[in-house]
Amino acid sequence: MLKFSFLFLTVEKPGGLFDFDGTLPLIAIQFLILMFLLNILLYTPLLKIIDERSEYIANNLQEASIILNKANELSSQYEKEFSKIKKEVELDSLTLQNLHKNILEIEIISSQKIFENYLNQTINNFDSEKEKILTSLDEEINSLSSEIITKIVA
């Protein structure tokens, strides 16, 4: 049986490997019909979907670039406004610091004046008390000295 199958495989039809009989045009027609059907049923809708997707992506990229440009413009505008506001805040801060410094200096000067007035008043009170005490001491000294003189003379 092995010999028979071997013989069957070695038998060739006339025409060799490429036989151009009636099957070749039939296969060519089938191939063309298949290509036509695949083109209509598969490739055309697929290409349409791919084109729509490409158009969708292109539109989204264009919108994204427009949004990005707007965002960059807004960012630069906000940065300018921020720097302007920052300068204003720094200027206000310096103004407030100077105002606070001036108020503090005025308070210190007024406190010094009040302290000097109080000190002068206290010194004047001490001087007047000193004068009173010295006067009373003079009177006591005079009275004691007159008593001593009367006791010595007596």
Curated annotation (Swiss-Prot):
One term of GO molecular function: proton-transporting ATPase activity, rotational mechanism
Keywords annotated in UniProt = ATP synthesis, CF(0), Chloroplast, Hydrogen ion transport, Ion transport, Membrane, Plastid, Thylakoid, Transmembrane, Transmembrane helix, Transport
**GO CC list:** chloroplast thylakoid membrane; proton-transporting ATP synthase complex
- What topology does it adopt in the membrane? Single-pass membrane protein
The entry's localization annotation reads: Plastid, Chloroplast thylakoid membrane
User: What domain of life does the UniProt record list for this protein's source?
Assistant: Eukaryota
Entry-linked InterPro entries: ATP_synth_b, ATP_synth_b/b'su_bac/chlpt, ATP_synthase_B_chain
Membrane-traversing stretches: 22-42
User: What's this chain's function?
Assistant: F(1)F(0) ATP synthase produces ATP from ADP in the presence of a proton or sodium gradient. F-type ATPases consist of two structural domains, F(1) containing the extramembraneous catalytic core and F(0) containing the membrane proton channel, linked together by a central stalk and a peripheral stalk. During catalysis, ATP synthesis in the catalytic domain of F(1) is coupled via a rotary mechanism of the central stalk subunits to proton translocation.
Quote additional remarks.
In plastids the F-type ATPase is also known as CF(1)CF(0).
Q: Which family does it belong to?
A: Belongs to the ATPase B chain family.
Q: Subunit comment for this entry?
A: F-type ATPases have 2 components, F(1) - the catalytic core - and F(0) - the membrane proton channel. F(1) has five subunits: alpha(3), beta(3), gamma(1), delta(1), epsilon(1). F(0) has four main subunits: a(1), b(1), b'(1) and c(10-14). The alpha and beta chains form an alternating ring which encloses part of the gamma chain. F(1) is attached to F(0) by a central stalk formed by the gamma and epsilon chains, while a peripheral stalk is formed by the delta, b and b' chains.
What protein does this entry describe?
A: ATP synthase subunit b', chloroplastic
Species this protein is from: Vaucheria litorea
Name of the gene this protein is made from: atpF2
